[in-house]
Regions:
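GHKL (Bergerat-fold) ATPase N-terminal catalytic module, capturing the glycine-rich phosphate-binding loop
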Residues: 1-165
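GHKL/Bergerat-fold ATPase module in large chromosome/replication-associated machines
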Residues: 97, 117-139, 158-163, 168-391
Length: 392
């Protein structure tokens, strides 16, 4: 037995139990490895057909298998035996890959004491088998047996986490992370094979109708929306759909969202993609050009994220401007529910203030009236700096 370099048992515990806040993370990390391996091979042959097979066995062992580029013996030594080494970080195609830190495989040690990786490289060489243990030791053997190009990872779950490997629970986790990944994912259970993802989701289809987007959003978020509109940003390459909530929201309440990074689910928070005033918006977006933190649970706060947020803010304002000009009925529906938020937008944008002003409602001594109605009634408008209270 040999020991993983630059690590001790405590280092593995730190990475596997403290960087990753959710025990389900191992599914995401293994799917990410599969996707990146296939992407690496498709960068050589763009017509290559990749697929991912996940086997949930009766003894609750789980196998993740891909037909991607695979690993040679020297690559196993370099990338599996040194914490923090990644085969993807410094390559010319690094932007195509989801992972880049070289620590994701360690998330498996949250749910297992042993990880087995079997691989055959598309670049040649003998098949290899690497078996790593939670105490930091590993064994590496070569095989003369024929095996297909690609890799498979085998996990034997710890007793405390057996419930994650129950069929319905495991399938839900697998779908959550892998639903829109670009390669087909098949779940194998009790001799049956099931496709669990949609490589071409409707919300990434530029030809999707408003109704299709609204129906999909209602299914995903278990809540209807007033309206839906598509966005795309040059900075960060953020693409997807923004939904207008059908109920009034508080500035302090955080709504649920779905943010994907290179089509892998990253977070159900907005990850600071939305402007601070956009509390009436729910986002379903994918970012191909932004960076994740090491835990892959949020986005790195940098100039790219800041610029993407600005572009999304402009897109929301353009959407509202378009409604005023082309769909006054929808604008009025949104205004009825979200006039506080629209006032907040108008207060920081003089152009929108002039555009929206006559439609914005204000409390008066004659009830709630639009500013246009107030202005047309008198040339003199008196106002208070505190909330109006009618005294009887």
């Amino acid at each position: 037995e040999m020991c993983i370099r630059d690590s001790l048992k405590g280092m593995i515990a730190l990475l596997s139990e403290h960087i990753y806040s959710n025990p389900n993370t191992f599914v995401r990390e293994l799917l990410q490895n599969c996707v990146d391996a296939i992407t690496a091979l498709r960068n050589i042959d763009e017509n290559y057909k990749g697929r991912i097979d996940v086997f949930l066995n009766e003894d609750k062992t789980v196998v993740f298998r891909d037909n991607g580029v695979g690993l040679k013996e020297e690559e196993v030594y370099r990338f599996l035996t040194v914490i923090g080494e990644s085969s993807k970080r410094d390559t010319p195609d690094a932007d195509d890959f989801i992972g880049r830190f070289g620590i994701g495989l360690l998330s498996c040690f949250v749910v297992t004491n042993e990880i087995t990786v079997e691989s055959r490289s598309a670049m040649g060489g003998q098949p290899v088998c690497w078996c790593g243990k939670v105490d930091g030791t590993y064994q590496l053997t070569l095989s003369d047996e024929e095996r297909p190009i690609g890799s498979q990872v085998v996990l034997h779950p710890k007793g405390d986490w057996m419930h994650l490997f129950e069929y319905e629970t495991f399938k839900k986790i697998l779908v959550s992370y892998g639903e829109v990944l670009p390669y087909p994912i098949y779940l194998h259970y009790q001799g049956e094979e099931e496709l669990v993802n949609t490589p071409s989701p409707v919300w990434l289809d530029p030809k999707a109708t408003r109704k299709e987007l609204l129906d999909y959003g209602a299914k995903v978020f278990q809540s209807s929306a007033l309206d839906a509109f598509r966005i795309y940003t040059e900075s960060g390459k953020v693409e997807g759909v923004l939904y207008v909530l059908p109920f009034r929201t508080q500035f302090s309440v955080r709504n649920s969202h779905k943010v994907y990074l290179k089509r892998m689910l990253l977070s159900e928070d907005d990850c600071n993609l939305l402007p601070p005033w956009a509390f009436f918006i729910r986002c379903l977006v994918n970012a191909d050009g932004l960076l994740s933190t090491a835990s892959r649970e949020s986005l790195v706060s940098n100039d790219q994220l800041k610029d993407a947020r600005k572009e999304i803010g402009v897109a929301i304002k353009d959407y509202l401007r378009g409604l005023v000009q082309n769909d006054r009925a929808m604008f009025n529906r949104i205004l009825d529910v979200h006039h506080f938020h629209i006032k907040a937008i108008a207060s920081e944008d003089n152009e929108l203030l002039r555009l929206f002003m006559d439609y914005l409602p204000f409390e008066t001594n004659k009830g709630l009236r639009s500013f246009g109605s107030i202005r047309s009634a008198s040339n003199v408008i008196c106002y208070t700096t505190v909330s109006y209270t009618h005294l009887t």
